[in-house]
Amino acid sequence: MEQFHGTTILSVRRGNQVVIGGDGQVTLGNTVMKGNARKVRRLYKDKVIAGFAGGTADAFTLFERFEAKLEMHQGHLIRAAVELAKDWRTDRILRRLEAVLAVADSKASLIITGNGDVIEPEESLIAIGSGGPFAQAAARALMENTQLSAKEIVQKSLTIAGDICIYTNNNLTIEELNDEGK
C-alpha cells in the first residue's frame, strides 16, 4: 500500500518569539486525501509546540510518545527529545515509524528524526517535509533581509512553499510561543 506523505513544517525563532507552522494537505500517492489536517499543535501545558512531517498515523503515535516523555520529564524539552530518540532506536515498533518532528519551547528548537537523531538547527530555523527546502530558502531570505516577525516569516515562507510544492497547500496552522523574559 502507498504511504501518506508530503507536507511542509517550518519553525522560526526570532527575538523572544518562536513559531512553528505547517500546511494542511494529506496526500496518498497522487491524490489529495485531506486539505485541512492539523500537523502543528501545542503540548505540555501549552509550553511546547510541535509539528510533524511523514506518515500521519506514525506522527500521531510519536506525538503521544513525545508528550508522555514531556510529562515524565516535567516539560524539559531536550531531555524528553533524547529519551524519545533512545526509544525510537531500540523499540521495534517505533523503528518502523516514518515521521520527523519539529519541536520547540521558549529556549530550544529541535528536530527529532526517524533514525532517532536529535538535532538542534543552526540559525534558529527548521524546515522539514517535501516543501521544506522551499520554505527554508524563503525564510532565510526573509530573516536576513527584513525585520518581519517570526510569525510573518513563517506565514510568507509557507505560502511560497505551497505555491511551489505539489504536496503542500496554503491551509496553514501556525502556533507561537513568546518569552517575555528575553
UniProtKB/Swiss-Prot annotation:
Keyword Cytoplasm among UniProt keywords: yes
Active site: T7
Catalytic activity: ATP-dependent cleavage of peptide bonds with broad specificity
Subcellular localization: Cytoplasm
GO cellular component labels: HslUV protease complex; proteasome core complex
Stored Pfam families: Proteasome
Disulfide links within the chain: none
Magnesium is among the record's keywords: no
GO molecular function: metal ion binding; threonine-type endopeptidase activity
One annotated GO biological process: proteolysis involved in protein catabolic process
Binding site for Na(+): G162, C165, T168
The protein's Enzyme Commission number: 3.4.25.2
HAMAP family per UniProt: HslV (MF_00248)
Quaternary structure, from the entry: A double ring-shaped homohexamer of HslV is capped on each side by a ring-shaped HslU homohexamer. The assembly of the HslU/HslV complex is dependent on binding of ATP.
PANTHER family xrefs: ATP-DEPENDENT PROTEASE SUBUNIT HSLV, METALLOPROTEASE TLDD
Similarity annotation: Belongs to the peptidase T1B family. HslV subfamily.
Protein name: ATP-dependent protease subunit HslV
Gene: hslV
